[in-house]
Amino acid sequence: MSALPGPLAKSFENRAMATNFHGFAWALLRRYWRSLSLSVNVDELSMVDDNGAVNELISRGGRLIWDEKKVVDNFLRSMRNGQDDDLRRGVRSFNRIIKDRFVPNGLLPYSGMISLAIELLADFSKLRSYLSTAFPVVLVDEAQDTNALCYIFLKGLLSDESGICMFGDPIQRVYGFIGAMEGLKTKATTDLCLSPMELEHNHRFSGGSIVGELGAAIRSNMKGAIANGMPRLPIYVGAAQQDEATAIVSKVAALIQVGVGRIAILVRKRGALADLIMEELTKEGISYFNGLFSDTSQEFIEFNAFALSKVTDAASGEKGVSRSAADKIIDSISDELLTGSRRFEYGRSYAMLLGALRKHLKNDCVAMSPSERFDYIVSIFSEGSLRRFSDYLDADISMMTIHSAKGLEWDTVFIPGVTRFDWPGGICSRCERAGICSRSAHECRIVDAKKMPDGLIEEMGLLYVGVTRARKAVYVSASMQRRTNYGNYQVACPSCLTFLPGIEPVSWSVMDGEG
């Protein structure tokens, strides 16, 4: 809403709710938990990552019998595999275990938030009718990343009179590994009676933008075609990962000197190369935001639960929070992270995001009443959506994974580690055996784009997301040696993603000289 002109934003304040699936489910459970026969309000429960839920339950003295463990495993597997029919059949059994085993031990698995909300909507038609009246139109952004469980929840929110629009880009579907549904566009078109529409132009990149041309070329490759033109991809190739890290930080320092604006270093995943880059940044005295934490990690979930308890405790007995009270609450949480007894690995990063939230509240939420401000802050920590305020960070340099950078933008983006076996990863061996690619000592190229496996196409989509996070310039890098998961070193080369048909790789210096 902050992007809208003042009067227009004000007119929407009481007519629109911006949240995510988990945030909306949490809001329902906070109000209607008794209807589900829960023994306590969900505010009193600790969120726990699905993967660690059973172990956390056992550590608290809880237990699951074999059949219950099997139900939980099968349900989560169906969610990851996008099997919505299996989820519908299993949701009641899964929820029974949530209520009988997890909730009495103070726990709520992350997916349990959605599954309980599904049951709530299914059992209480009046609530469903009320919601469809209160929210007659539902807009879903980044729809391509919707998983099967959230899709069932979405359908439960809708009535025959509901309006729904889903916005997304199948090419940017990068969460398949945790359940983002394949073929969602086709399925939603049938299930929800939607009319598919496709935009022909990306208006973010107009007037011959280098970044826009690169993005278009990557998209064409994902569709098995070659775009017109030959956009250039700036790439640095180091002898080893240490050389790559040193070159990136040296380039970042040079760009800071000339004032290029905000910069991001976006890695495929945290690992040896990311650690080397951060060590170099620290050595050079360059301040940066470390955003390499996962929004679904147990630590981040625990941080949000901790912050939420601080907010609710501070506002206990009050009708809301004033602007000054909100500042004090945020400051107290930050102080606890940095100097108190509650320590997190990414505590400094969370504190920086709290500062960004404070700035957002000051700049964009002046017109909120105390009760609206309280509900808004509660929703942020309930959803775990603090990262979306990254634009308000005081740090000009950010380090994140590409997955967590979706929806964000920077002036300049670095994409390290586009090295064979690191990116696209283990699929490299399969591609070579199938004759899809051709490898030499210095490069790997795709020779038969029509046979590309889905896994390789998804890795291209991840590269596309990374490239299009840049407004002005993008720099890619690779190395001729990589560190394996076992700590050994292996001869490598730039991956096929740096030599896609229709894209010309050039050195950073050549690109800068022409710019």
Q: Regions from the language model: what does each represent?
A:
Residues 311-481, 485:
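Conserved helicase C-terminal RecA-like lobe
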Residues 17-23, 109-112, 117, 395-402:
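Conserved two-lobed SF2 helicase motor
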Residues 245-369:
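Conserved helicase/translocase motor-coupling segment
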Residues 2-74, 285:
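Conserved P-loop NTPase-based nucleic-acid remodeling module centered on helicase motor cores
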Residues 447, 454, 472, 478-515:
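Helicase C-terminal subdomain and adjacent C-terminal extension
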Residues 193-194, 200-286:
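Helicase P-loop NTPase motor core
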Residues 151-231:
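Conserved RecA-like helicase ATPase core segment
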Residues 58-139, 148-150, 176:
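Accessory N-terminal region flanking or inserted into the helicase ATPase core
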